Amino acid sequence: EPFRGRFADPYDGEVAASDAAVGGFLAALKKKGLYEKSLVVFLSDHGEGLGDHGEDEHGVFLYREAIQVPLLVKLPSARAGEKPPLAGSSVATPVQIVDVLATVADAVALPGVTPPEGTLSLVRLAAGEKAPPRRLLAETFYPRIRFGWSELRSLVDGSWQYIDAPNPELYDLATDPGEKKNVVADKAGPIRAMKAEVEKRKSGFVAPEAVDEE
């Protein structure tokens, strides 16, 4: 409450509660005279299935509804009364949550901070800097830890999205943004290259294990 009773769908109530919490936070910054000088980053760590691809939660699959999340940045204003730099700008280049550190370090000139190799600053992208080509990796271990199924990994390369699974999937996001038509049988070349990239990335990570509930 007060949102639970106002919405038939509990998820809608959660969205409204989150919206109110963010609004209250921004209002408090303004009331204290801190909003203009503040760097504000709003993001989510995951999306939600809501019935898409048969999933009514999150964590099981790696389709766009789960891995494409909001990421908004408000930069500090140079002087009181001025609009924040790059206000209203958007970035068409696909980015990752790991790009937040590079963005924050760039926005407020954090001393002694070296962002991880391969990450990008959204500040520079919004200002017009071109991003180098990147393959974006996502992964979920929830199916293995929770159900004993296979873990999944997804690699986005341009318009292609490859899902590394016991039955691999490949989607052309340019023509099929809803990921309805698996074209893995028709695209052996992209599959080989993306599968090799996933295997290379896997070798550099340690997989998490389930936490004992006790």
Where do the protein language model's features map onto the residues?
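Catalytic domains that recognize anionic headgroups
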Residues: 1-214
